Structures are given as structure tokens and as C-alpha cells.
């Protein structure tokens, strides 16, 4: 999960997800060998991590199905021992699905549908109509040019 402001400032934020193994017919490699899956070592639930970085950890407050985060809950991301962001909503196959919210510690957030419309809020409080779309690595938040902000 990328939790950097430069991603939000450019109006594209990558959110935890990966191609659904339900769609591909292949189960995820939950052995720890695939860096695109990350495990909450307390709950022993795995979440999709399409853009892995070093020293990442997650904490999941929800259910597991087949070892993968499922249903309503909060996924908290940390890097180098510091919280970097949260994903809140309903998860399926290890990724946020339906109505949800992602937020970063610097105050940026997206509230909306996965996939679908929502509002991207920048750290300065500016609000931008946006939408989430699936791409080859997960969710991308697309927004119009920053001049179309609402306050």
C-alpha cells in the first residue's frame, strides 16, 4: 500500500488490492514468498499488497476466510514501525470492495465506492470529485485536474 502524499497530489493513489484469485482461478501464494500479499501476524490473515515496500506491516480487525481478509473491518498499514494509513470498509479476496474509506497519516483520504465515485480530500482540506477504477495492479483513484477542486 502506498501512503505517500505525492501519489495523492498527482490525483492517483494506489490502494491495497491485487487481481482477484476468484477471477483468475488461482489461489494467492500465502506462503510468504509472494511480496504482493502481506500477513497480519497476529490474526494470520493476508491482504493484497500490489506495490510492496520494505518494512511494511498490517493490522486487521475483521474476519478471515481461507486465510484472506474478508468482510467489514479496518486494515491499518505501518511502515518502519509507524502507522502510514488505514483502509476501512468491506473487503473481499483481500481487497477493499464496495463503500469504503482509505486515509493517510498526513490527512489525505478517499471516501467512496470501490469501484466507483467518491471524494478525494487532500491534506490542505481541498476536496476533489474522483472515482476508483481497477487496473492491472489494483485500484487507482482518478480525479480531474486540481483546478476542479471543491472546498
Regions found by a protein language model. Name each.
Residues 1-9:
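Bacterial N-terminal signal peptides that target proteins for export
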Residues 11-15:
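Repetitive helical segments and hydrophobic/amphipathic motifs
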Residues 17-19:
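N-terminal signal peptide c-region/cleavage motif recognized by signal peptidases
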Residues 21-151:
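Glycine/tyrosine- and acidic-biased, solvent-exposed loop/turn segments at the edges of beta-strands
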